[in-house]
């Protein structure tokens, strides 16, 4: 099993973390992540940082969590993921090297034992802000309401 530690930068700038690793400018594709996290490669023990949909660094060192409630079954990778989420608004995906179990750290909380679909859903919720998702729905709603002139009447009646 190959472990992974993937940091998704959000509002907090992570330049300080990025400087601890090797700078990259790469697409986020399975082949690239697989190469980075392949056991034995120089970058596989650190974290990948993703900014604006691009891998900007690999082999980065993250702050470790001091959370005493973490189970003994969680190693350095999980402590680093949790620590990063305690110190920033970043979202961190952790894949256990030993078990392959997927976890997600955000706001100092580690959500464990995610399958791919649950991870996808959580990331989609976190990465696409509600106002953006709502804005994406607006053109469809406008088309539906304006079909056959119903939208004009609905707007006029709503304004009264």
Where are these regions (language model features)?
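Divalent-cation
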Residues: 1-160
């Amino acid at each position: 099993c190959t472990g992974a530690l993937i940091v998704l930068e959000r509002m907090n700038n992570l330049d300080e973390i990025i400087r601890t690793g090797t700078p990259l400018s790469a697409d986020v594709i399975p082949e690239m992540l697989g190469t980075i996290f392949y056991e034995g490669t120089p970058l596989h023990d650190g974290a990948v940082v993703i900014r604006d949909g691009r891998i900007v660094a690999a082999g980065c060192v993250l702050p470790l969590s001091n959370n005493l409630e973490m189970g003994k079954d969680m190693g350095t990778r999980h402590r680093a993921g949790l620590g990063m989420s305690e110190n920033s608004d970043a979202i961190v995906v952790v894949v256990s090297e030993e078990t392959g179990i997927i976890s997600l750290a955000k706001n100092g909380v580690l959500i464990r034992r995610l399958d791919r679909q649950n991870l996808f859903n959580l990331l989609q919720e976190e990465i696409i802000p509600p106002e953006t998702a709502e804005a994406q729905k607006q053109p469809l709603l406008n088309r539906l309401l304006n079909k056959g002139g119903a939208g004009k009447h609905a707007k006029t009646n709503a304004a009264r």
